[in-house]
Regions:
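Predominantly the structural core of cysteine protease catalytic domains
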Residues: 1-62, 69-100
Length: 100
């Protein structure tokens, strides 16, 4: 499986730092997340919530949420990579260099 959006997202995080994205936060699994890797099967793709991807491993994105340190793993969630889990690849925002 190769997702060009995911490749760009990983490359830009590596080069420039954290990237804002949108995710589907409506699932019970997302709402009650406390550890592990949130898999695609446990969340939808109807994005409704902004979060910040701060890093990644080959298996998951490291995502900072705005719901405070009491939620998730001290305010973070690990979301499965490679399958657009929770719609994470849908609305990634990162800058590109433009020549003027």
């Amino acid at each position: 499986y190769h997702d060009p959006v995911e490749s760009h997202l990983a490359r830009n995080i590596h080069t420039y730092g954290p990237i804002p994205v949108a995710v589907d936060s409506t699932s019970r699994a997302f709402d009650l997340y406390h550890d592990g890797i949130l898999q695609k099967e446990h969340c939808g793709n109807d994005v409704d919530h902004a979060v910040l991807v701060v890093g990644y491993t080959p298996e998951y994105w490291i995502v900072k949420n705005s719901w405070g340190s009491h939620w998730g793993q001290n305010g973070y969630i690990y979301i499965e990579r490679g399958r657009n889990a929770c719609g994470i690849d849908t609305y990634a925002s990162f800058a590109t260099q433009v020549s003027i």
